[in-house]
Amino acid sequence: MSLGGSVRRHIAAIGTAIKHLLAPRMTVKYPDVHHVPIQTNYAFDPKRGAALPGWRGRHLLYLDKCTGCNLCYVACENIAEAIVMVTLPEEKRPQNKKSLYPAVDYGRCIPPWTNIVTSDGIVPIRDVKVGDKVLTHTGRFRTVTKVFRRRYTGRLYTFRTLGNIERLSVTEEHPLLIYSRGRTEWAFPQQIGYGSYLVRPVIAEYADPEEITFTYEMYHPSGRGGYFTLNHDSVKCTAELMRLIGYYIAEGHADRYRVSFDIDKKEVSIARDIVAAAKTVFGEDACLRPDGRSEGLKLVIDSVKVASFFSQFGTRSDEKHLPPWALRLPQHLAGELVRAIFAGDGHYSNKYYDYMHSNYFTIRTTSRLLANQLLYVLAGLGIGASACSQDQKHRKTCYSVTVHTPYIDKMAQVCGIEARNNPPYSHSYIKLIDGLILSPVIELDVQNVEDLEVMNLEVEGDNSYVASNQVVHNCVFCGFCVDFCPFYALEMTPDVELSEYRRENLFYTPHELAIPPRRLARPLVNPRFEGERVKHMAGG
């Protein structure tokens, strides 16, 4: 070898070493501290159909023991969705006549801006921490046990479903929960086309609070200056309070010293209800003040305490939102809340045409967060609703939450309006079945991304979470495949670190899982994606 060639090889080796040192890890190290024997690093609860998280590492495959029976694939199906069977013609072994071996995918994630439904509200996944509770496909809130971050290069799938203002973007191997042929099942993005039904759960955990506590600052003048004290107070959680909150979300504004409600002069019944509820709940009088900007009515409550209470719901129209406890109210209280919001910002359309009868309920708001939250509140009342956005020239974007047949009857009962379902002309493609809201895919986009930060969660018990109002699978390697293998061909290491530059390298082929592992000159690609094309057709 020439001197120049030797120098180039040494420089290349040093460059590779530096690149490895500076590159971020694609996944985290298992476990962080604790080490356990291989036999106890997984568990499975057959009654719940869920893999229980534990300490575990990557898979180990004994090629001389694997018979290609597919049992590991069957065990992984609908749990981790990480194993796929691949054919290796060069691996001719007597016990595996088809040369069929398992490969494992270790990388599935979503972008960090994706909104996640947690017990503390709807927040971006970048703000979710270990110990937080997230909504799962069962409608329950379960604890996050791991948070994963990595860089991703590959295809990014983006879905938009009917009645959902949020778009869901996932990497090419991140399973989504769909409803097909009368049941739910996990599907990969490339298997989902136009008309496929994605799902979101109805919140099944309710809390009936007796009272709501809050704090407020009170100013005390003293001499030339003064001082503030932090006071604690509470109000009973009653129907009157829920209606007052609903009126505030629709028509209210709060500053440091007062709360005001701007209503139309014809809405006399609403004005009377606000005055009565303010007196009953807070013991405060609501006075009428002229509104120089319009011919409407302005009801004002001059109270620092009351203003502090209502500030938790947002002070401006585009900032209005419900606190976390309001998403889990029992139906009798949630109904009063929706009734008041509809009275202030709602509309019932009942039109007859020569060819059809069209009727629907709609609530309009400039708060994107509130529109998303109302979908869950209405679902808890047994009402399937849809949300859409409309850009307005020189005005804020408007979000409409709409209810069609077959949910008109229930919405009419909640809002106190005479209305009936219109079965012959149902316009609702949003379905509520078995505690799940189903909505069809209406937009699908696939793009190639490079070095994009993506994230994933590991969720205790249910192994799923709600992202952009759709159920996605979490990251879990439970080891159930190890328990399912009758030939002891699979094991899992108690401690491993996966560190790769590109997404493709996180797909471990049978050779890379083997003992000892070996890389091929031309790595295999996941057969799920080789030569695939996205189907841009209805129901494709």
Which residue ranges define each predicted feature?
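Short, intrinsically disordered, charge-balanced linker/junction segments flanking boundaries
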Residues: 104-108, 112, 470-474
